[in-house]
Amino acid sequence: MNRYVSVLALSGIAVLAGCVAPTPKPNDPYYAPVLPRTPLPAAANNGSIYQAGFEQNLYSDRKAFRVGDIITITLNEKTQASKNANSQVGKTSKTGIGLTSLFGAVPNTNNPLGDGDLSLSAGYSGDRATNGKSSAGQGNSLTGSITVTVADVLPNGIIAVRGEKWMTLNTGDELVRIAGMVRADDISTDNTVPSTRIADARITYSGTGSFADASQPGWFDRFFLSPLFPF
């Protein structure tokens, strides 16, 4: 008996452990800054007016376009979703049978109780109806800015960027992570790009600490909210 109790206890702990969301940790290698693949050769400072180390093409600008360059992303995300459903199903049926004779004979319809004549007629009626309503709504808003690095440049000129920002507050840590693809034409002259212009964007806003823990249900509540709960 004790063995079965131990097995059930361990199974319950495993189920509850699977319901716990993973806590984000800093220094994720995926979001680490990306450095240039090959270092640029050092240019000799051999001129007082012109130096090769600070040369720039006549038609180029200071926008990020190489691996390891820095670019600032302006976060301006706002989503609003709602859904309503209303369904009604109904069915009505009615059946009546009227008989005046039974096998060719007319039975005696006198009621011995004196409440009227008896009849062979019969009837049936039934109604069924089902109504269902459901509604759901969700809204999110995220504003701010984060500076990331260029992780890769595709052959067609699309720039892959990713990075993260951690902020340590009195009650815990807050983080913002972002990764996606940016067109070079969408980068403004001040080397910024809005988050709405990022393709395949992966934006994460989370945190740790007392505030984040307070928003999470306890282990007992997670047990009843688990999809494995039979009721």
UniProtKB/Swiss-Prot annotation:
Family indicated by similarity: Belongs to the FlgH family.
Naturally occurring in which organism (per UniProt): Pseudomonas fluorescens (strain SBW25)
Name this protein carries in UniProt: Flagellar L-ring protein
Membrane topology field: Lipid-anchor
Signal peptide range: 1-18
Lipid attachment, kind S-diacylglycerol cysteine: 19
GO CC terms of this entry: bacterial-type flagellum basal body, distal rod, L ring; cell outer membrane
PROSITE patterns per record: PROKAR_LIPOPROTEIN
GO BP annotations, alphabetical order: bacterial-type flagellum-dependent cell motility
Location of this chain's protein in the cell: Cell outer membrane; Bacterial flagellum basal body
One of the Pfam families matching this protein, by short name: FlgH
Keyword Cytoplasm applies: no
Oligomer and partners: The basal body constitutes a major portion of the flagellar organelle and consists of four rings (L,P,S, and M) mounted on a central rod.
Keyword Membrane: yes
GO molecular function: cytoskeletal motor activity
Gene name in the database record: flgH
Record keywords, A-Z: Bacterial flagellum, Cell outer membrane, Lipoprotein, Membrane, Palmitate, Signal
Taxonomy of the source species: Bacteria, Pseudomonadati, Pseudomonadota, Gammaproteobacteria, Pseudomonadales
Function: Assembles around the rod to form the L-ring and probably protects the motor/basal body from shearing forces during rotation.
Lipid positions (N-palmitoyl cysteine): 19
